[in-house]
Amino acid sequence: MANCCHHYRVKNARLILVEDDPFTRATLGDALTLHGFDIRARVGTAFDAIDAQRKHDPQVALLDLDLGVGASGIDVAIALRKNNPKIGIVFLTTYKDPRLINSNIPSLPDGAIFLNKLEMNSTTKIAIQISLAILKPLAKRALPWVRSGPLSSMSAIQIEILKDIAAGLSTAEIARTRGVSEQAIDKSIKRISKNLGIPKSADSNLRVQIVRAYFENKGQGI
């Protein structure tokens, strides 16, 4: 299997790593160096990512979606692509759907590759996807949360209500902040639970089940 994938490996490609967690930034950067990539910069903020692009002219950027307070990885990727229309873009995150960061996220740059950290059990798989992003930076690619997953059929408003529930807001508080009735929020919660595959028998602890599903889809199971 390794031999069939070797063709897709790009050696010595200039790469910048944008990841706000210092440990992940260090270990992943070291691992990708062993795979032959030229890691020009390892940064944790949007500002440093743009500065690294200006200094190093990378062929590809590997980005976490959630960079903490401020710009997201998607915002950074859009800025990088504006400066270089053919830079390869790869997102590596625990989130199964980026709308859990921001329900009104901008469109991902054309050709962006989205990888889930929990499904990438080896850096070899990540290295192959990075190479594909370099070879075909603008190729049409299907995004995993669009075609499948419990959140794929949920609207932006439902995602926001899901986040409100996870934050501990009551039905009355959610209704008040959204300017709608509590009955409307109750209906939305029932639709959300259906989308998440929560059985009707779970009514007594429905909120607990919804919160658990929220964190599972963030890659932070409880």
Regions found by a protein language model. Give the residues of each.
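N-terminal regulatory/sensing modules of transcriptional regulators
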Residues: M1-R141
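Basic, Lys/Arg-enriched C-terminal extension of HTH/homeodomain DNA-binding domains
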Residues: A2, S193-I222
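Residue-level marker of regulatory loop/turn positions in helix-turn-helix DNA-binding domains and
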Residues: H7, V69, S153-M154, D203
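Intrinsically disordered, low-complexity protein-interaction/activation regions
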Residues: H56, A156, E160, K187, ...
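Regulatory hinge/linker segments at domain boundaries
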Residues: A139-D164
